[in-house]
Amino acid sequence: MTTTLGRAKILQSQVNKTAREEPEAFMSRCDEKYEKLVEKVLQHINGNTERSKIIMLSGPSASGKTTTSLKLKQGLERRGIRAITISMDDFFLPRELTPELPDGSRDYESVKALDIALLKSVLLQLVHEGRTELPTFNFKLGRRDKETRKVELPNGSVAVVEGLHALDPIITSELPDSHLLKLYVSVSSDFIDDGGRTILTAREVRLLRRTIRDYHFRGSSPENTLDMWDSVCRGEDLYIRPYKKNADITVNSVFDCEPCLFAHTAMKLFESIEENSKHYDRARRIIAALGTFEQMPLEIVPVSCVLREFIGGSEYYNKSTRHRTV
């Protein structure tokens, strides 16, 4: 049975009232709420150390998987449990071997974009031998580096494996279920008005996150992010959401205050979408929706907050390289 952490609908009028009256306290409460969700996962792991030798952490794009995996690692180490993190992004196939879509573009959302044989081999080595060598994918060159990184996983320690396809049976079927804990992290709440009408869908909240992150850290314009978005969503529906049911625990990574935090930056970015763009109507709809939220300054977001994964300034990343620091 899956344990679900987090609620489904968020009332905009309450969000705006709190953002207007006490923005800093609102931010703090939202952050504390997520930390408590992470703490519940840690308590579950702590009580099931043998079963949790490998934590498979999945979820769609811009869900906060990476920071959540690092928070889990940090929390485990505070409890005296040795932990390592593994990013499935390091197991991408070389660019030229990535499957193609019918239009000739590369299908980076498919599980078949990964070197599945290598990934399974690495995970099985960790389970049975307690050691392995991890690749590093060079995104600039579109291939893995020649050098690998040796890691060990002694008895009583935990590996947190994070990636879009971490719950896909293609990857997990040969791993001993007695050693696995399966997590699914995603934004799972819509923002609604007093009449129950949806203002922002959960998927649109993730689009805001991704647009801001891609612009600031991946050199991607809002137009380009929107160009990719339909393919990203198609990949979610085909390759990620069907396996949500396999999760032992699902975590809702939404922050009630995030439309208020993202509104100013996201509106400016979407305003760059020109009228002749095929994305113009979508951009204008999101701008209109964000315009109905009170705005809060990004400066009040704690450096340890998951949202820093998208706006920068996270204590979990090197400021100049965006590499993990824990």
What do these predicted regions represent?
Residues 1-40:
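Charged, amphipathic alpha-helical linker segments immediately N-terminal to NTP-binding catalytic cores
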Residues 55-57:
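Hydrophobic anchor at the beta1->P-loop junction of P-loop NTPases
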Residues 29, 84-86, 93-142, 158:
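Conserved nucleotide-sensing/catalytic segment adjacent to the nucleotide-binding pocket
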Residues 51, 120-177, 226-243:
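Glycine-rich phosphate-binding loop used to anchor ATP phosphates in small-molecule kinases
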Residues 23-28, 35, 172-326:
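Conserved NTP phosphate-binding and transfer environment spanning the P-loop NTPase/kinase superfamily
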Residues 65:
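Conserved lysine of the Walker
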